[in-house]
Amino acid sequence: MSKLITTEPLKSMAEVISNYVIQRESFSARNILNKNSLVKKEIRYDLEVPTSADSIWSVYSCPDIPRLLRDVLLPGVFQKLDVIEGNGGVGTVLDIVFPPGAVPRSYKEKFVNINHEKRLKEVIMIEGGYLDMGCTFYMDRIHIFEKTPNSCVIESSIIYEVKEEYAGKMAKLITTEPLESMAEVISGYVLKKRLQVFGFEIKPKLRFNLLLCLIICLVIAGGMFVAGVPL
């Protein structure tokens, strides 16, 4: 029996287990290496606007903003900007195509966060675009900060992760320029709407003079009324 009973089965089991552990450790090491080979970047553009935070946020958070950008604020910029899923709220997916020569030419993006309390909107790229050029993650973040009751700051950020070997190339391609354009046209749109009286645009420099004239007219009219002078 001593010749029949050996430790070979236990040796085989030990070898199988040790090989399994080694493979798991090797797999974990590769995962750590892959994670370490990703570069995370964040770039930002701030624009101060002389109007309330709520008025600016009302445009950024508007469910109709895809149509507004395509047809009103940035006409001619997009070859296509279609809502293919959702109604303008969280979960909405846009299919965006730019004219030939643009980089990137096309991509799909998704609204993943619209926080009215914080005035925060986050949109991630889910297909095409920079994801086909070395990025593993790309997000636009818009945060509207109130500065005073009549002024605010539009904080436009881009957060992305890219494979280390593509980091230099993508740093040259990814800029805040698209978000800058959006912030400028939206703020201009809000200011123009706010400064209209009876359909006529009132330039910012004339606001104080207009208000002063209105006050003087009211004072004169009030004085004439008190004095019994017919108006």
UniProtKB/Swiss-Prot annotation:
Catalytic machinery residues: K121 (proton donor)
A GO MF label: (S)-norcoclaurine synthase activity
Main location: endoplasmic reticulum
Reactions that this protein is recorded to catalyse: (4-hydroxyphenyl)acetaldehyde + dopamine = (S)-norcoclaurine + H2O
Gene3D superfamilies: 3.30.530.20
Activity control note: Activity doubles within 5 hours of elicitor treatment and continues to increase for at least 80 hours.
Binding-site list for (4-hydroxyphenyl)acetaldehyde: D140
Keyword annotations from UniProtKB, A to Z: Alkaloid metabolism, Endoplasmic reticulum, Hydrolase, Membrane, Signal, Transmembrane, Transmembrane helix, Vacuole
Subcellular location: Endoplasmic reticulum membrane; Vacuole membrane
EC number: 3.5.99.14
Pathway linked to the protein: Alkaloid biosynthesis; (S)-reticuline biosynthesis
Designated name of the protein: S-norcoclaurine synthase 2
The species this protein was found in: Papaver somniferum (Opium poppy)
